[in-house]
Amino acid sequence: MQCALYDAGRCRSCQWITQPIPEQLSAKTADLKNLLADFPVEEWCAPVSGPEQGFRNKAKMVVSGSVEKPLLGMLHRDGTPEDLCDCPLYPASFAPVFAALKPFIARAGLTPYNVARKRGELKYILLTESQSDGGMMLRFVLRSDTKLAQLRKALPWLQEQLPQLKVITVNIQPVHMAIMEGETEIYLTEQQALAERFNDVPLWIRPQSFFQTNPAVASQLYATARDWVRQLPVKHMWDLFCGVGGFGLHCATPDMQLTGIEIAPEAIACAKQSAAELGLTRLQFQALDSTQFASAQGEVPELVLVNPPRRGIGKPLCDYLSTMAPRFIIYSSCNAQTMAKDIRELPGYRIERVQLFDMFPHTAHYEVLTLLVKQ
C-alpha cells in the first residue's frame, strides 16, 4: 500500500506497511504458532485476509488546529497535530465528509479542544459507514453542552451537504484525559442506529456499541464461526461478550436455544433488534457481565462461544468453564497472547482447529478463531 503520510514520516501507525501482505500473513502465522507451541493443534486453516486499503468503516479523528482551520487526525507524542484525512485505510466515501466537516466546524463555532491549555470544546469526530447502504453515523465528542444550541442551528447545512448522514449525535466527554467518549449521548437525528448487513444477517450499529472496523474480514469471521457451529451437534449455546450479536445471530438456527451476554446495553439493544428481524424467538440477549452470568447458571449448554476484549476471558471464567465443562468452546480473540494464557487455564480441552483473520493489515495485530473440544 502506498501512503504519502508514511513516506513523509508524518504517520507511523502502519508499522508493517513496507512488507507485502503475504509476508505480513507469514509473520502473523508464525507468531500465532509460537504462542500455541505448547498445545497440539489438530488443524491449521489457511489465514483469511481482505483488501489492503480503503477497508476501514470507521474514522476516529482528534480535532485540533483553530476553529477557522481545523485539523482532523491525531496528535503526536509531543502534542504536534497531524491531519489524516488522506489516510488510505479510509474508503473514498470519507473524503467528501471530511471536506464538508471543516467549514461546518467554523460555521457552528466548535472550537477545537486544546490539550495543553485545557480549553476549547470539540475533542473528536467519530465517523462510521454502513457497507450495506452507504449510510453514515457521525458523532461530535464535546467537552460540554455549551455549543450544543449552535451546533443544532448549523446542522441543516451539513445535512444538506451530506444526505448520507443517517445518525448524528453529540457525546459529552468532560474529563481532561485521552478518553474517546463519555456516558452522555445526545441524538440530533430521529434515527438512532445504523443498519448494516453481513452474509444476509441484519446488524445494527449504535453510538456506544463496539463494531468491527474491517467489514470484509469481519463478515468472513462470522461466516466461518457459523460453518464451524453447523458441523457440531449443538442445540443450546451461549454467546459471551456478544457485542451487537454478530456471532450468535450468524450461528443460531430456528430450533437452537441461544443466550447472548454483553455488558453494554447499547449493543444488546442492537442484538435484540436483529433477532426480531430474523424471527429467531429462541434467542435471548441480556446486558450483564459475562463471567457473573456464566457462574450463576445451572444448565450447561453444549457450546460456549467467547469473544472477549484484549484482556481475554480471565481465570475466574476459565475456572468456571472447566467446572461446567461444555462439550465445545469457540474462542474468538483479538489478542492471541491472552487467548493462549486462557487456554492454559482450560486443561480439559484440546485444540481442534485454528484460523487467523487479518483484520488489521500493516500492523502486528490479528484476530484468531479457535475451536476447543472437551477431552
From Swiss-Prot:
CDD domains on file: AdoMet_MTases
Gene assigned in the entry: rlmC
Binding site for [4Fe-4S] cluster: 3, 11, 14, 87
Family of this protein: Belongs to the class I-like SAM-binding methyltransferase superfamily. RNA M5U methyltransferase family. RlmC subfamily.
Residues that, per the record, bind S-adenosyl-L-methionine: 212, 241, 262, 307
Disulfide bonds: none
Its job: Catalyzes the formation of 5-methyl-uridine at position 747 (m5U747) in 23S rRNA.
GO biological process, alphabetically ordered: rRNA base methylation
Key words of the record: 4Fe-4S, Iron, Iron-sulfur, Metal-binding, Methyltransferase, rRNA processing, S-adenosyl-L-methionine, Transferase
Name of the protein: 23S rRNA (uracil(747)-C(5))-methyltransferase RlmC
Pfam families: tRNA_U5-meth_tr (PF05958)
EC number: 2.1.1.189
Active-site residues, Swiss-Prot/TrEMBL: 334 (nucleophile)
Claim: Transmembrane helix is one of the keywords in the record: no
Catalytic activity, reaction form: uridine(747) in 23S rRNA + S-adenosyl-L-methionine = 5-methyluridine(747) in 23S rRNA + S-adenosyl-L-homocysteine + H(+)
UniProt-recorded Gene Ontology molecular function terms: 4 iron, 4 sulfur cluster binding; iron ion binding; rRNA (uridine-C5-)-methyltransferase activity
